[in-house]
Amino acid sequence: MLQPARTKYRKMQKGRMRGKAYRGSDLAQGEYGLQATECGRLTSRQIEAARVAITRYVKRGGKLWIRVFPDKPITKKPAETRMGTGKGNVEFYVAVVKPGRVLYELAGVDDASAKKAFHLAAHKLPVATKLVKRGETL
């Protein structure tokens, strides 16, 4: 699973998801990309499940880049615990995603394979996505 090796602070505030993603909204390496069209939080398990779905479909045919990293810790209190007495322990890490953010990039495959692979990956993710192609307006 993806998670930071070290962090400056163990716990983080909840924060808000507002606006669009301006950074990370263009294709950097690949020919095709999977772009988020709504905001949400991707856990490291969801990112990994989508990666496995893509790599299993394209097999050794293409090169895949993961463009998001889960660096935000999410805390949770144990069950049947009274309120108060501080913040809970870190349970998992998430990547905060805004609309327009490219999540995955793929190169070395044809249009149909990229479309099918990203379609399989989109089912594993909690945000709505669309396929983008290099050269087309994003």
UniProtKB/Swiss-Prot annotation:
Quaternary assembly: Part of the 50S ribosomal subunit.
Role description: Binds 23S rRNA and is also seen to make contacts with the A and possibly P site tRNAs.
Organism: Anaeromyxobacter dehalogenans (strain 2CP-C)
Family membership noted in the UniProt record: Belongs to the universal ribosomal protein uL16 family.
GO terms classed as biological process: translation
Domain of life per record: Bacteria
GO molecular function: rRNA binding; structural constituent of ribosome; tRNA binding
GO CC annotation, single: cytosolic large ribosomal subunit
Keyword tRNA-binding: yes
Keywords for this protein: Ribonucleoprotein, Ribosomal protein, RNA-binding, rRNA-binding, tRNA-binding
InterPro entries cross-referenced by the UniProt entry: Ribosomal_uL16 (IPR047873), Ribosomal_uL16_bact-type (IPR000114), Ribosomal_uL16_CS (IPR020798), Ribosomal_uL16_dom (IPR016180), Ribosomal_uL16_sf (IPR036920)
Protein name: Large ribosomal subunit protein uL16
